[in-house]
Curated annotation (Swiss-Prot):
Residues 1-150 are annotated as: Disordered. This is F-box only protein 11. The lineage of its organism: Eukaryota, Metazoa, Chordata, Craniata, Vertebrata. Its main location: nucleus. Substrate recognition component of a SCF (SKP1-CUL1-F-box protein) E3 ubiquitin-protein ligase complex which mediates the ubiquitination and subsequent proteasomal degradation of target proteins, such as DTL/CDT2, BCL6, SNAI1 and PRDM1/BLIMP1. The SCF(FBXO11) complex mediates ubiquitination and degradation of BCL6, thereby playing a role in the germinal center B-cells terminal differentiation toward memory B-cells and plasma cells. Residues 28-73 have a biased composition (Pro residues). One of its GO terms (molecular function) is ubiquitin-like ligase-substrate adaptor activity. Pfam families: Beta_helix, F-box-like, NosD, zf-UBR. The keyword Hydrolase does not apply.
Length: 930
């Protein structure tokens, strides 16, 4: 459609007559300069007029030759022009220490001289291989007789005695081809004619650039700093590369063509007043298609490019700021089929319609690139004030431009729009402050976008949708009003090594069945989640750093899926990964750490496979599972948290298997309020509040775990909880093995409980568990203790080799027992009593023996004070004493806390005045964090 519209609306081009071609038809007595290979053979030294481009009179050697005919006004007073930089005027006296040893001195006469410069001296002259510079062919060697002849006086004076400053002044009036011919005269002229100051002045008069513009190959232009360039004369080198071209310079064409003698030798330069004329002229003249657009504002020209032309701005300073092409009615530039190798660079391109909201402008753009063309757009500033459409539109099969170093900013619509199977390479562009997305990719568009700076957009940074694709690498995307990168409706981009940060909402937003691969990016400091995945989307998030977000790291909700793998997620204000509302991602091999909230938060029926992650040093729980969620957590390392390792609450379910859970400030695992997870084959150790805590009607199937080295009980069961524990090894705890109290229940079956500091199993306060086929042995206190009106069913248990004894039942406890084996226990309590020792000797802050304890009315002790039977017999003999009960206790007499000293105990110990039961665990409170 675009091609048809362009063909119908394109005006007829009429090229201007070119006086240069007329000059070539003049009589042969004034032919233009010929290329080097067509020059006549060099003449002997006694014929100086044929060797020098501006030959002086033969009879007046002392004065310099008269200048050529007066140049036009812009060349008058070439040494004092206002538009020539001051450093050129200051250095025009000669090459100085740069290029020549000739400083304010004259050459002495030489008896002999060669007929032409040496090969080394030619290196300073023209090095171009093009026919545009009229170099003489290398001189042939002259005979010895010719070398013995004396040079003519004028030639000697010009070549050997005239000061460098005077020669440079003469050379300053020459054009480029004359300078190249002068460089062929002798070594001294070669050095002076290649003076960079001469070429800089000449270069700026033609091209206006204040820095050399290099053009080493088609489609490649770049400016350099002359001081840093390896070539001794970059101005001349650039002149050679840019020599053959057309110049759009309004007002100058008439002057140029009306002074053919003044510009003799510049047949390879064409001048036009408009870009349209230049486009037609270079095609009719069979030029290479190089067009220089000089400083100015060019308005409402119809620029439809359907040939491989090269169009570049030419201006001093920042070139693109001073060459402005604008259209108010139609697309400013349209590239059509046939413009495969076209180049447009170093200019400002604007689309500025009068009615900025008109719908018919929806198809109008600053740049429009259509099917089967691959132009290069380089170093351009692109602006559009139209509120519909886009600034740059690339559409159609075979549309494959290269857009690089451009600034697409401050547009009232989309910055760059790639659609309908278009491709292309887009590198090093600045895309900012656009009203809509910085980049749209739609309908199978598949660009390669590298190192672009996409920021401060008033919408999303990059938006791929409706099957849009693309490869985005090393882009900096930040401070956009919506997400930095949005993927929607089956779009499938690849985003690699980009920085996506400081978004006013999120970093990456994938929704409505979006896909995509996000690999090795840095995603940080976004106001919402670093990555959002929702509504059946299934992206791959691999190897990214996602950190310091004002909310969470990765947020998956609304049936979202995706692979979250190998990421480093840390320092976020909310959960590192959040999974909710039936979402089911795969989360593996990530590091989730140092968050201000939890590590992984699964809620509202969230699912997912969470495996082989390392979750550590988070402020709240390492993993939260709640409100009907059923994730599978497998082979993770969850450690060093400031609260719980894994926390199931409010009907949280799921599978927790083969994990290492260790070194948490609270319990390794907590289960409460109807939660019923399957916890199996885990290693749970180093918890400051115990291994597993099941409370507030918690459930759970806890099987084949190893629970050890916890500061408190290996497993706590309390407050109407009813879990099942099978085949676990619970050992080496710094408190009891399993503590059940406050109405706790549960089935404990086939567990090995050994080497714990307190009772292997402590049952207290109205609890009623079932213990079946357990082995409880090698404990540092009792095997099983039942107290505080608790009951239990004990069937087929083996209780042996425990220090205090096998089974201890407090007063008022009724137990159902069947087929238990209680054997070979050390019975340290009975032995201490039989030896008359105070039971304080065998107790400690973590180990309370169960025996008869008393109070002494004579010593005014209270119910909170307990005295062992031996202290009653020895220390309180004859006192009014009262038997309290048979229970776990700590002898206050032996501890030295009563008024009378104990005669059986050793050093007194400060009494904590606590109840004689295991210290209660710390329960997590989640309400304030939900």
């Amino acid at each position: 459609m675009n091609s048809v519209r362009a063909a119908n609306r394109r005006p007829r081009r009429v090229s201007r007559p070119r006086p240069v071609q007329q000059q070539q038809q003049q009589p042969p007595q004034q032919p233009p300069p010929q290329p080097p290979q067509q020059q006549p053979p060099p003449q002997p030294p006694q014929q100086p007029p044929q060797q020098q481009p501006p030959p002086p009179p033969q009879q007046q050697p002392p004065p310099p030759p008269p200048p050529p005919p007066p140049p036009p006004q812009d060349r008058n007073n070439a040494g004092e022009r206002d538009d020539v930089p001051a450093d050129m005027v200051a250095e025009e006296s000669g090459p100085g220490a740069q290029n020549s040893p000739y400083q304010l001195r004259r050459k002495t006469l030489l008896p002999k001289r060669t007929a032409c410069p040496t090969k080394s001296s030619m290196e300073g002259a023209s090095t171009s291989t093009t026919e545009n510079f009229g170099h003489r062919a290398k001189r042939a060697r002259v005979s010895g007789k010719s070398q013995d002849l004396s040079a003519a006086p004028a030639e000697q004076y010009l070549q050997e005695k005239l000061p460098d400053e005077v020669v440079l002044k003469i050379f300053s009036y020459l054009l480029e081809q004359d300078l190249c011919r002068a460089a062929c005269v002798c070594k001294r002229f070669s050095e002076l004619a290649n003076d960079p100051i001469l070429w800089k002045r000449l270069y700026m008069e033609v091209f206006e650039y204040t820095r050399p513009m290099m053009h080493p190959e088609p489609g490649k232009f770049y400016q350099i700093n002359p001081e840093e360039y390896e070539h001794p004369n970059p101005w001349k080198e650039s002149f050679q590369q840019l020599y053959k071209g057309a110049h759009v310079k309004p007002g100058f064409a008439e002057h140029f063509y009306s002074n053919p003698a003044r510009y003799k030798g510049r047949e390879n330069m064409l001048y036009y007043d408009t870009i349209e004329d230049a486009l037609g002229g270079v095609q009719e003249a069979h030029f290479d298609g190089l067009i220089f657009v000089h400083s100015g504002i060019y308005t409402d020209e119809w620029i439809y490019i359907e040939s491989p032309i090269t169009m570049i701005g030419a201006a001093p300073g920042k070139v693109a700021d001073k060459v402005i092409i604008e259209n108010t009615r139609d697309s400013t530039f349209v590239f059509m089929e046939g413009s495969e190798d076209a180049y447009v660079g170093y200019m400002t391109i604007r689309f500025n319609p009068d009615d900025k909201s008109a719908q018919h402008h929806n198809a109008h753009h600053c740049l429009e690139i259509t099917v089967n063309c691959s132009p290069i757009i380089d170093h351009c500033i692109i602006r559009s004030t139209c509120t519909v459409g886009s600034a740059v539109c690339v559409s159609g099969q075979g549309a494959c431009p290269t857009i690089k170093h451009c600034n697409i900013s401050d547009c009232e619509n989309v910055g760059l729009y790639i659609t309908d199977h278009a491709q292309g390479i887009y590198e090093d562009n600045e895309i900012s402050n656009n009203a809509l997305a910085g980049i749209w990719v739609k309908n199978h568009g598949n660009p390669i976008i590298r190192r672009n700076h996409i920021h401060h957009g008033r919408d999303v940074g990059v938006f791929t949708f409706d099957h849009g694709m693309g490869y985005f690498e090393s882009c900096n995307i930040h401070r956009n009003r919506i997400a930095g990168f949005e993927v929607k409706a089956y779009a499938n981009p690849t985003v690699v090594r980009c920085e996506i940060h400081h978004g006013q909402t999120g970093g990456i937003y994938v929704h409505e069945k979006g896909r995509g691969q996000f690999i090795e990016n840095k995603i940080y400091a976004n106001n919402f989640a670093g990555v959002w995945i929702t509504s059946n989307s299934d992206p791959t998030i691999r190897g990214n750093s996602i950190f310091n977000g004002n909310q969470g790291g990765v947020y998956i909700f609304g049936d979202g899926r995706g692979l979250i793998e190998g990421n480093d997620i840390y320092g976020n204000a909310l959960a590192g990964i959040q999974i909710r509302t039936n979402s089911c991602p795969i989360v593996r091999h990530n590091k989730i750490h140092d968050g201000q909230h939890g590590g992984i938060y699964v809620h509202e029926k969230g699912q997912g496979v969470i495996e082989e992650n390392e979750v550590y040093s988070n402020t709240l729980a390492g993993v939260w599972v709640t409100t009907g969620s059923t994730p599978v957590l497998r082979r993770n390392r969850i450690h060093s948290g400031k609260q719980v390792g894994v926390y199931f609450y409010d009907n949280g379910h799921g599978v927790l298997e083969d994990n290492d859970i260790y070194n948490h400030m609270y319990s390794g695992v907590q289960i409460r309020t109807g939660s019923n997870p399957k916890i199996r084959r885990n290693k749970i150790w180093g918890g400051q509040n115990g291994g597993i805590l099941v409370y507030n009607s918690g459930l759970g199937c806890i099987e084949d775990n190893e629970i050890f080295d916890n500061a408190m009980a290996g497993v706590w069961i309390k407050t109407d909880s009813n879990p099942t524990l099978r085949r676990n090894k619970i050992h080496d705890g710094r408190d009891g093995g399993i503590c059940i109290f406050n109405g706790g229940r549960g089935l404990l079956e086939e567990n090995d409980i050994f080497r714990n500091a307190q009772a292997g199993v402590l049952i207290s306060t109205n609890s009623h568990p079932v213990l079946r086929k357990n082995r409880i042995f090698d404990g540092f206190a009792a095997g099983i203790e039942i107290t505080n009106h608790a009951t239990a069913t004990l069937e087929g248990n083996q209780i042996f080799n425990n220090r205090f004894g096998g089974l201890f039942l407090a007063s008022g406890v009724n137990v159902t027992m069947k087929d238990n084996k209680i054997m070979n226990n050390q019975d340290a309590i009975e032995k201490a009593v039989s030896r008359g020792q105070c039971l304080y000797k065998i107790s400690s802050y973590t180990s309370y023996p169960m025996h008869d304890f008393y109070r002494c009315h004579t010593c005014n002790t209270t119910d909170r004070n307990a005295i062992c039977v031996n202290c009653i017999k020895k220390c309180h003999q004859g006192h009014d004493v009262e038997f309290i009960r048979h229970d776990r206790f700590f002898c206050d007499c032996g501890a030295g806390t009563l008024s009378n000293p104990c005669t059986l105990a050793g050093e007194p110990t400060h009494d904590t005045d606590t109840l004689y039961d295991s210290a209660p665990p710390i329960e997590s409170n989640t309400l304030q964090h939900n």
